[in-house]
Amino acid sequence: MAASFVIVIVISFFISLAFMCYVHYTSRQRRKLHGYGHEKAVRLPPGSMGWPYIGETLQLYSQDPNVFFASKQKRYGEIFKTHILGCPCVMLASPEAARFVLVTQAHLFKPTYPRSKERMIGPSALFFNQGDYHLRLRKLVQGPLGPDALRALVPDVEAAVRSTLASWDGNVSSTFHAMKRLSFDVGIVTIFGGRLDERRKAELRQNYAIVEKGYNSFPNSFPGTLYYKAIQARRRLHGVLSDIMRERRARGEPGSDLLGCLMQSRAGDDGALLTDEQVADNIIGVLFAAQDTTASVLTWIVKYLHDHPKLLEAVRAEQAAIRAANDGGRLPLTWAQTRSMALTHKVILESLRMASIISFTFREAVADVEYKGFLIPKGWKVMPLFRNIHHNPDYFQDPQKFDPSRFKVSPRPNTFMPFGNGVHACPGNELAKLEMLVLIHHLVTGYRWEIVGSSDEVEYSPFPVPKHGLLAKLWRDDTVSVETDGCQNGDNDDNGVAMV
């Protein structure tokens, strides 16, 4: 009896302690957010902050994140607050609000990532920074990713596409894994030109794969954990890159590729050359940005074309005409030909909208900011919700329908932001689209494929892709027929997709 009484007392103590912590936390939040440090009470956006310390993180991860954000928008409107991943956040789901944060008042919101992510990629990487350093570096990076450089890169992208499809031929494989290989190869040739030997390439691929596995892991530095292994692999990556830079300097040939441009740039403080650390951070950052996002979109494109057979035949007809002009594919694709793929380009735009690989982006308010009568407190995270905007019927009619014809007319300003917006928009977006165009050309004119198993479920790794990476069997078919009847005259296919 005495033991039971003691247990009751102990349990009651901890319940009381938890209740007092809750009261302390909520009262502290109210003082902080309703007049603390302000002459008048502030008005926060509507929403829920969830449980103390935990916030609404459990709700976010117990369901599709897009469903979580969509339900919040439906309940609270286009600006609402929440508390996730240990941070108070303001979510913005309107084009005007996204432009406010990313363009017109971008100086009030800094890019922000968890410290563990910065450590893994490198704190000097382009997308972790702002201000003069960011502007100098962005201008530098845009050179090797601009039209002139991409024009010369078409043969390399085409070679990478051919190699990827050839290795897949006759096999059942994860589409996502195949597309990751392709995106990595394109990233390597963009960074290093054609000057990287296979040994170095294998070292980079092997260590980057370990970094990638640990990117979303819990930041635990105990030996054996994914995070620990990723940090060790990141150090080895830095070592490989340092060796490559040392070899180039010894030859007196830094090169004109992205690595060479970074090595010769005076984008550092006070016009100084970038340090090897800064160069390595940016190379690893480019590899990260170039691989998973592009591979995810390519995976969805393969699925969307498979699921809409008449659309596939219309795309095949467009690409077959280009193939015929290239002597049945014996001649290489040209930059001009990639600019002429009108229907294929619309398919890519609709895939970017429909999949919305980048559902949102993180910013942090550097001062108290007022927007439409609401306060965004200093230090709060701010998240423009791209997917919510891309799937809003006010901007895209019947948004759950895959309809490339909607891009016959340009979307309303700030309603379509697959690569972000403002000074932090992805500088490699044209390279990504070139990769997609070349992949589609060779896929539809030389191969057939079928999806194995269900493709309706979605997984996050870390970007959304069909479950298991979209298992598919692909086989070579040089006799691919082109059935164009009704496919280029605005007819609907069997899946209700309007053709362009």
From Swiss-Prot:
Pfam families the UniProt entry points to: p450
Protein name per Swiss-Prot or TrEMBL: Abscisic acid 8'-hydroxylase 3
Subcellular location(s) per record: Membrane
Biochemical pathway: Plant hormone degradation; abscisic acid degradation
Function: Involved in the oxidative degradation of abscisic acid.
InterPro entries per record: Cyt_P450, Cyt_P450_CS, Cyt_P450_E_grp-I, Cyt_P450_sf
Keyword hit for Amino-acid biosynthesis: no
Protein residues bound to heme: 426
EC nos: 1.14.14.137
Protein keywords: Heme, Iron, Membrane, Metal-binding, Monooxygenase, Oxidoreductase, Transmembrane, Transmembrane helix
Cellular component annotations (GO), alphabetically ordered: membrane
Record PANTHER family: ABSCISIC ACID 8'-HYDROXYLASE 4, CYTOCHROME P450 26
Biological processes, Gene Ontology terms: abscisic acid catabolic process; sterol metabolic process
Top-level taxon of the source organism: Eukaryota
Enzyme class at the top of the EC tree: oxidoreductase
